[in-house]
Amino acid sequence: MRFLFTDVNPMITHGLGRTLTELGETVEIIDAGLASQQDPDSLEHAISSFNPDYVCSQGGWGKLGDIIFPILRRKGIPHIFWASEDPLFFESLSLPMARNSQYVFTTAAECIDKYYSQGIKAHLMLFACSPSFHHRVEPDPRFNHDCIFVGNNYSQFPARLKGMEIILKPLIDKDFDLKVYGLDWWLNRQNRFFIEPHIYGGGLAYEEMRTAYSSAKIVLGLHSVDTSPTMISMRTFESLGCGAFYLTQWTPAVENLFSNHEHLVWSKSPQETVELVEYYLARPEERQRIARNGQAYVYARHTYHHRAEEFLNALQTPAVGSRHDYGCCYTVDSNFNRRWRVMKVKRVAINMKNP
């Protein structure tokens, strides 16, 4: 099959799009937002020249949908939407996109019923890692710190701000060897949370993240959602895939998907964060054991090959269905590991060849 992706987000370029190519599908990735700004006609030209079976997008387009959805309707090409901003932007971004899509995937299980209340069939598809990209590499002295955080300052989200207070602030207050990488919003004193220049490590290209993850003793994690049973930061899967020792704020999704002190470590308070960092900095062998376990676990359950299977199997089901034939549900076992099963959907083999 032929898939045209409209986003150059790493979860596509190094994730789902990359993996579909590895599985033998034909994939083209364009920056539809940039293209529409330069020349609105270029989108229709790209679609016509590639002639995709499906056009796929993630997140949200804003006004771009006003341009591209009429093109897809004229050409009879189905649209696939991965609502990667759920649940935070369900109403403002996801729902308008989903209403114009034939297949909808969400990272937040709790949103599935919300879609169904709007007559929209939705499937669960979490973030993941790509072992062909997310793996350990040669350490770099630039990132040889006790603790690092890679990400942007989204302190406008209450859960994210809470995580900063639990994970970052106590380490800053105790003067640990910590570097924070991301956009320079971190230095803006008008934000609800900011850091001093000596803590800021600057911007970091996505291709350099695995080097940073392979070099630091502890990689820190924050999440913008702390109420979802499934939605967590994509960095969780990526850092574990790179063999990092990952210490993160606790959320229900982290506990549902992973085991504490086995795959990663979570903290529920500033005091616990300091205690965990002091404990594991003094015990490199334990850090390495947990990091190996975490990498093995995501490689076994949470790669984009797993997601591509879920994705391709969902495309074998009718694009429009009743409330009773929808995709995914979840149960929690005694170890708090979430296990997914597909209801009334026949599992089919992935077609490894182009048509």
Q: What are these model-predicted stretches?
A:
Residues P87-Q102:
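Membrane-proximal helix-turn-helix segments that form the acceptor-binding/catalytic region
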Residues L264-P270, Y279-P284:
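Conserved acidic donor-binding segment of nucleotide-sugar-dependent glycosyltransferases
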Residues M1-A46, F50, G59-I67, Y103, ...:
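Nucleotide-sugar donor-binding catalytic core of glycosyltransferases
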Residues L72-E85:
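Active-site proximal beta-strand in glycosyltransferases
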Residues Y279-P355:
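C-terminal amphipathic helix plus adjacent low-complexity
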Residues I67-K75, P96-M97, I167-P170:
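Catalytic-core regions built around general acid/base machinery
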Residues C56:
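N-terminal Rossmann-like NAD(P) cofactor-binding module of classical short-chain dehydrogenase/reductase
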